[in-house]
């Protein structure tokens, strides 16, 4: 039973590597936007209402 578990884990890992590489180009824009939001939060932008509405997707 443990051998079957290991085979499933290894197969899943091997299959996920090529799909991760193929999706890097498509996810580049999403990753950039996410990192921009994190930067705004760390700078305190999302705690001020005008900035939060524009960049953080929240309304007060």
UniProtKB/Swiss-Prot annotation:
GO cellular component annotations, sorted alphabetically? extracellular region; host cell postsynaptic membrane
Cystines in this chain: 45-51, 46-56
What transmembrane ranges does the database entry give?
Answer: none
**InterPro entries in the cross-refs:** Conotoxin_a-typ, Conotoxin_a-typ_CS
Tissue spec: Expressed by the venom duct.
**Residues bearing PTM Cysteine amide:** 56
Any Pfam family the entry gives? Toxin_8
Q: What is the effect of changing residue 48 to A?
A: 16-fold decrease in inhibition of alpha-6/alpha-3-beta-2-beta-3 (CHRNA6/CHRNA3-CHRNB2-CHRNB3) nAChR, 2-fold decrease in inhibition of alpha-6/alpha-3-beta-4 (CHRNA6/CHRNA3-CHRNB4) nAChR
Q: Has the keyword Signal been applied to this entry?
A: yes
Modifications the protein undergoes after translation, according to the UniProt entry: The native globular disulfide connectivity of this toxin displays multiple conformations in solution. In contrast, the non-native ribbon isomer has a well-defined conformation. This ribbon isomer is inactive on alpha-3-beta-2 (CHRNA3-CHRNB2) and alpha-3-beta-4 (CHRNA3-CHRNB4)nAChR.
Alphabetically sorted, this entry's keywords are: Acetylcholine receptor inhibiting toxin, Amidation, Disulfide bond, Ion channel impairing toxin, Neurotoxin, Postsynaptic neurotoxin, Secreted, Signal, Toxin
Q: Where in the cell is it found?
A: Secreted
Q: Locate the site labelled Critical residue for distinguishing between alpha-6-beta-2/CHRNA6-CHRNB2 and alpha-6-beta-4/CHRNA6-CHRNB4 nAChR subunits.
A: 49
Effect annotated for changing residue 55 to A: 150-fold decrease in inhibition of alpha-6/alpha-3-beta-2-beta-3 (CHRNA6/CHRNA3-CHRNB2-CHRNB3) nAChR. 21-fold decrease in inhibition of alpha-6/alpha-3-beta-4 (CHRNA6/CHRNA3-CHRNB4) nAChR
The positions making up the signal sequence are 1-16
> What GO MF annotations does this protein's record show?
acetylcholine receptor inhibitor activity; ion channel regulator activity; toxin activity
> Source organism's superkingdom?
Eukaryota
UniProt function note: Alpha-conotoxins bind to the nicotinic acetylcholine receptors (nAChR) and inhibit them. This peptide potently blocks numerous mammalian nAChR subtypes: alpha-6/alpha-3-beta-2 (CHRNA6/CHRNA3-CHRNB2) (IC(50)=0.258 nM) > alpha-6/alpha-3-beta-4 (CHRNA6/CHRNA3-CHRNB4) (IC(50)=1.54 nM) > alpha-3-beta-2 (CHRNA3-CHRNB2) (IC(50)=5.72 nM) > alpha-3-beta-4 (CHRNA3-CHRNB4)(IC(50)=27.7 nM) > alpha-4-beta-4 (CHRNA4-CHRNB4) (IC(50)=69.9 nM) > alpha-2-beta-4 (CHRNA2-CHRNB4) (IC(50)=121 nM) > alpha-7 (CHRNA7) (IC(50)=272 nM) > alpha-2-beta-2 (CHRNA2-CHRNB2) (IC(50)=800 nM).
What does UniProt say about this protein's domains? The cysteine framework is I (CC-C-C). Alpha4/4 pattern.
The miscellaneous comment for this protein is:
Negative results: does not inhibit alpha-4-beta-2 (CHRNA4-CHRNB2) nAChR (IC(50)=10.400 uM or >20 uM). Exists in two forms, due to cis-trans isomerization at 49-Pro-Pro-50.
Protein name (record): Alpha-conotoxin BuIA
Q: Which organism is it from?
A: Conus bullatus (Bubble cone)
């Amino acid at each position: 039973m443990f051998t079957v578990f290991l085979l499933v884990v290894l197969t899943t890992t091997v299959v996920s590597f090529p799909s991760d590489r193929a999706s890097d180009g498509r996810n580049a824009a999403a990753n950039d936007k996410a990192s921009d939001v994190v930067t705004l939060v760390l700078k305190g932008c999302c705690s001020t209402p005008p900035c939060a509405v524009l960049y953080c997707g929240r309304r007060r």
